[in-house]
Amino acid sequence: MPTELQKERELTKFNPKELNYFLEGSQERSEIISNMVEQMQKDPILKVDASYYNLTKDQQREVTAKKIARLSRYFEHEYPDQQAQRLSILGVFDPQVFTRIGVNLGLFVSCVRGNGTNSQFFYWTINKGIDKLRGIYGCFGMTELAHGSNVQGIETTATFDEDTDEFVINTPHIGATKWWIGGAAHSATHCSVYARLKVKGKDYGVKTFVVPLRDSNHDLEPGVTVGDIGAKMGRDGIDNGWIQFSNVRIPRFFMLQKYCKVSRSGEVTMPPSEQLSYSALIGGRVTMMMDSYRMTSRFITIALRYAIHRRQFKKKDTDTIETKLIDYPLHQKRLFPFLAAAYLFSQGALYLEQTMNATNDKLDEAVSAGEKEAIDAAIVESKKLFVASGCLKSTCTWLTAEAIDEARQACGGHGYSSYNGFGKAYSDWVVQCTWEGDNNILAMNVAKPMVRDLLKEPEQKGLVLSSVADLDDPAKLVKAFDHALSGLARDIGAVAEDKGFDITGPSLVLVSKLNAHRFLIDGFFKRITPEWSEVLRPLGFLYADWILTNFGATFLQYGIITPDVSRKISSEHFPALCAKVRPNVVGLTDGFNLTDMMTNAAIGRYDGNVYEHYFETVKALNPPENTKAPYSKALEDMLNRPDLEVRERGEKSEEAAEILSS
């Protein structure tokens, strides 16, 4: 007998596989990813199942190391873009493996590429075999115990010794200890260290250096002290560590010198823009945008599949069957916006990825040619990318955290089971909201240049959304966001002129969020092709309604939307969009092309046999043969203890009282 999910799947009027071509950017890329998924779920070392959720911290570390060793065999046959695609998939079902490799191939390699000369990049990556996970293993040494978001406040020092042509790396005090460094505890042989450049007594600010941590025998280098951070909220498969340096000497050419250079005689050439030193972080933020799409798609798929199967309560006493969760308006209001968000995240991730690659190529070409005009133009593009990636990283990682937990709650008690993935995923995910740019700090930092630019442009103000029909006009929706951003910028500017930007922090975060939503909405509608208009446009409008409602006070404050239209979003427009999306839910979730291994949730399987899979999973991992617990004696002793009078030897009984009082 077909399940509820299978019945609805048969009614889908479009091909989910072709929809996946839209989500992944092309048919070729979609098919490559499908082939990689098939490889990994058939690989006995790489595949995951529900037993993954029972692993201890030590087991996670060991299993992760074995998986990295196995992946190295795949990487030997793949180009960097293929490796990136494989890692992106891994991030869905095994994020700790993805991160443990990503710190090496993402952050370390990106740092060397972004800050090193072509020769340095070739030496530390291709020549060493790092792209094939051979030779050396890198980590990224930016964060310190006392400094994270304020990179310019980093206190590790790199002092030039002109006599020996070396830099001396030191940790001057406990607060300067490198902290949270992924891979440092056990894996990494080298670290891209952010340290203060000191030459002839002058401090030139924070620059980057490649510092060996371990020799070819994997023993620590002299002067290097490393420790394990220990248990964390999530991602225990990653060996995060701390590092201290005591007079560690490295050759002068271990400093990455694409922009800032130090000559043999100690002459320092400074970069055209300090922001260029942080290019590695932009790559990480772009990756997190793709992570947001993939992780949101995973958990909204699980929750919606469960909602199609699960029935609860009857609408009328005369009904013979209970109502599906998904047919309750509240359930749609809770979950459909995150389904829409996954689709918009996909568009944003693809755009950022393409823009970053093009910008990096332009910058590399300009620097190699030594053309100042081209370098300046590339720097402008890099700054735009910094703002866009910062807005999207912060906003979308926040929303993904919300998506995972809202999806969990929408599955009721079953969402709390480890075997349905929500708990581990949430614990693993939320670090994205604080690493590589704490979301609040990052949002404020990228909003400041946005506000300055907006203040240079003519003010945009006035009513935009005057009727419900305006909510179905993408151009007017984008214009509404433009007006909100323009109004906020002027209010922020008026305050900041006297009191500085810090006091406007909440408004700056709001600017960053609204800019991200504007970017996602505008880009999504522009990317929709005619054949997908009927299926996808309702998702875009539904997402816009959700954001207009969540930030309704801002749009009302600046007179951008009338109170009547604002009310009708919730009472008329949003419910009508939900009705359009509802018949397509199975096809839209199937469009993510997630196999059962990738969802790894008993209640979210493709076939919709929710209770059967869930019960069998629980029985398989917790065999019911022996129902007596290892700690049963403690319970038995408690239950079978003598009553209180016996334990008090009858000393407080009436009989004892008579004897003692006579």
UniProtKB/Swiss-Prot annotation:
GTP-binding is among the record's keywords: no
Region span, Disordered: 642-662
Keywords: FAD, Fatty acid metabolism, Flavoprotein, Lipid metabolism, Oxidoreductase, Peroxisome
Gene3D superfamilies xref list: Acyl-CoA dehydrogenase/oxidase, N-terminal domain (1.10.540.10), Butyryl-CoA Dehydrogenase, subunit A, domain 2 (2.40.110.10), Butyryl-CoA Dehydrogenase, subunit A, domain 3 (1.20.140.10)
Pathway listed: Lipid metabolism; peroxisomal fatty acid beta-oxidation
Localization per record: Peroxisome
GO molecular function per UniProt: acyl-CoA oxidase activity; FAD binding; fatty acid binding
Keyword Lipid metabolism annotated: yes
GO BP annotations listed: fatty acid beta-oxidation using acyl-CoA oxidase; lipid homeostasis
Basic and acidic residues bias (residue ranges): 642-655
Enzyme Commission (EC) number: 1.3.3.6
Enzyme class label: oxidoreductase
Primary localization class, coarse: other
Gene Ontology CC entries for this record: peroxisome
Similarity field: Belongs to the acyl-CoA oxidase family.
Quaternary structure (record): Homooctamer.
Name of protein: Acyl-coenzyme A oxidase 5
Organism annotation: Candida tropicalis (Yeast)
Lineage start: Eukaryota, Fungi, Dikarya, Ascomycota, Saccharomycotina
Gene: POX5
